[in-house]
């Protein structure tokens, strides 16, 4: 039974074909496409793939983009399933005031992180950071309850906001420095430390609430840029959303 996982973010669609809908399944093929080029999938990346038996995806880019993805899947004749956050799924309890309003990417990534944590050892609190166009910082207690999370602009959005709202800041991308001595480095360092500070504050909240140090995981396309600037060790995971989709699929499609 083959399984297609799809993650439709704000700028790109990422996909992976697995040999089974369960954690630990082998990857048969994978790829990514910018949202502007979704219509290429059926005739290019997906053209030589066998029809998946099952499909599960999450989308944050809106219904119009989701419909475009479904059109590319029509020739496979496989039912499409999309994650909508609920009160509880795959061992994670949703603490959001209105569970269905939580971003599906956040929900799926947290499920992936929780399952990865339990495979590694005993349950403990968890902080999950997803670094992309936007940055999310989630807190989960040892019992598997999502306590709440932060949303803040990603590094690119911060820089564009400063460039558009401030005269004279159209400068090349700089480096992260302890004591920046030019505008490029000051902008890059400021954005990086703003994100790192939000993460550190959430970690402290979890310690105060749960009474113990949380495990810390980071994912997302820009995670590798942030990891060296964190004040504590983070496990850098390539794609927690795919891991979450596999965990959900194992329960839904068994």
From Swiss-Prot:
GO molecular function: ATP binding; pantothenate kinase activity
GO biological process: coenzyme A biosynthetic process
Bound cofactor: record note: A monovalent cation. Ammonium or potassium.
Domain of life of the native organism: Bacteria
Binding site for substrate: 96, 103-106, 183
Function (record text): Catalyzes the phosphorylation of pantothenate (Pan), the first step in CoA biosynthesis.
Protein name (record): Type III pantothenate kinase
